[in-house]
UniProtKB/Swiss-Prot annotation:
Signal peptide range in chain numbering: none
GO BP annotation list: translation
Protein name from the UniProt record: Large ribosomal subunit protein bL21
Role played: This protein binds to 23S rRNA in the presence of protein L20.
PANTHER family named among the record's database cross-references: 50S RIBOSOMAL PROTEIN L21 (PTHR21349), LARGE RIBOSOMAL SUBUNIT PROTEIN BL21M (PTHR21349:SF0)
Family: Belongs to the bacterial ribosomal protein bL21 family.
SUPFAM superfamilies for this protein: L21p-like (SSF141091)
Cellular component terms per the entry's GO annotation: cytoplasm; ribonucleoprotein complex; ribosome
UniProt-listed HAMAP family: Ribosomal_bL21 (MF_01363)
Subunit relationships: Part of the 50S ribosomal subunit. Contacts protein L20.
S-adenosyl-L-methionine as UniProt keyword: no
Gene: rplU
Keyword entries, A-Z: Ribonucleoprotein, Ribosomal protein, RNA-binding, rRNA-binding
Amino acid sequence: MFAVIKTGGKQYRVAADAVLTIEKLEAEAGATVEFTEVLVIGEGADAQFGAPFVKGAIVKAEVVEHNRGKKVIAFKKRRRQNSKRSRGHRQHHTVVRITDIVAA
């Protein structure tokens, strides 16, 4: 069974025991989180589609760790002006392990 969940402005296709990196969640490592914004749940012809979410469907996950992504450099240069600016950014991520998918 699989599900499509929405978190952090993105959609992820998940299955039981899947490990996935998502946008940062405010939860401690080892804590359990629940995703209630489930868009699709099921398998094959038995899949249920939400409008926009499937009622009563919950995806449970365990927080494995928090980390940061690769550094992205934002560089701006104005030609012939002796002007340049460089700025780096590292996005915060949370690694979760899907433990259970509960259909309505």
